[in-house]
């Protein structure tokens, strides 16, 4: 029993998955070039992972509210 998932949802999920992997690692190594302290580099990498997660949640909520607005407009017609 397969569920049809919209392609936009899959694309968005893949984008944020890649960002969750790449951005913290990239942040760690870029900051490591400026300071030898791994605590700072690791902390900023963890912060970047949290930023990606928060942005994903905000995008998901906006998408959900847009769907409700579209459904509301269809019912009024």
Curated annotation (Swiss-Prot):
> GO cellular component annotations, sorted alphabetically?
endoplasmic reticulum; endoplasmic reticulum membrane; endoplasmic reticulum-Golgi intermediate compartment membrane; ER to Golgi transport vesicle membrane
Q: Where are the transmembrane segments?
A: 14-34, 39-59
For the motif Prevents secretion from ER, what are the positions?
74-77
Q: What are the record keywords, sorted? A: Cytoplasmic vesicle, Endoplasmic reticulum, Membrane, Transmembrane, Transmembrane helix
- Give the signal sequence positions: none
Q: At the top level of its lineage, which domain of life is listed?
A: Eukaryota
Q: Does the keyword Transmembrane apply?
A: yes
Please tell me, according to the UniProt entry, what happens when changing residue 74 to Q.
Secretion from ER
Membrane topology type, per the record?
Multi-pass membrane protein
Tell me the residue ranges located in the Cytoplasmic compartment per UniProt. 1-13, 60-77
Name one process (GO BP) from the record: vacuolar proton-transporting V-type ATPase complex assembly
Q: What is its main location?
A: endoplasmic reticulum
Subcellular locations according to the entry: Endoplasmic reticulum membrane; Endoplasmic reticulum-Golgi intermediate compartment membrane; Cytoplasmic vesicle, COPII-coated vesicle membrane
Q: Would I find Kinase among this entry's keywords?
A: no
Instruction: Outline which residue ranges sit on the Lumenal face.
Output: 35-38
Q: Family, per the entry?
A: Belongs to the VMA21 family.
**Role, per record:** Functions with VOA1 in assembly of the integral membrane sector (also called V0 sector) of the V-ATPase in the endoplasmic reticulum. Escorts the assembled V0 sector in COPII vesicles. Also required for normal packaging of the SNARE BOS1 and possibly the ER to Golgi transport receptor ERV29.
Q: What is this protein called?
A: Vacuolar ATPase assembly integral membrane protein VMA21
Source organism of this protein record: Saccharomyces cerevisiae (strain ATCC 204508 / S288c)
